[in-house]
């Protein structure tokens, strides 16, 4: 019985650890290459091309702190969600931080990875304190 409790506790802690997300500002993205994180910041500019939508967080291109890349093949499955302009809006994006030639980026495959950052959000309050 004791072993069953111990095994259950270990499994529960493992699941909690896996589901926990780190929330970081765009300026720290380069420190988290290869990690799945949630990054919250302002979209300073947006590039809409036929094959890709790119959001630039933390600064205008080429001085952005993070790029968010949405390929056309993924954009087509989202029924117009990525046709919206995100420029000037505060968002949170969740995904694995990758290292690209222009710095860190996150590839977005579905709209669930991008959420608006609400003004009364605890994350927004933390960012404004820093």
Labelled PLM ranges:
Residues 4-14:
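Sec-dependent N-terminal signal peptides
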Residues 21-130:
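OB-fold single-stranded nucleic acid-binding module
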């Amino acid at each position: 019985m004791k072993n069953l409790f111990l095994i259950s506790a270990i499994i529960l802690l493992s699941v909690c650890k896996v589901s926990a997300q780190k929330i970081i500002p765009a300026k720290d993205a380069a420190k988290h290459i290869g990690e799945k994180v949630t990054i919250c910041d302002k979209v300073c500019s947006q590039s809409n091309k036929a094959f890709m939508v790119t959001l630039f967080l933390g600064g205008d291109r080429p001085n952005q702190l993070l790029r968010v890349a949405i390929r056309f093949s993924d954009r087509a499955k989202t029924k117009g969600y990525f046709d919206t302009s995100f420029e000037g809006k505060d968002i949170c994006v969740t995904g694995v931080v990758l290292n690209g030639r222009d710095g860190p980026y996150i590839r977005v495959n579905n709209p669930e990875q991008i959420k608006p950052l609400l003004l009364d959000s605890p994350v927004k309050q933390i960012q404004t304190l820093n």
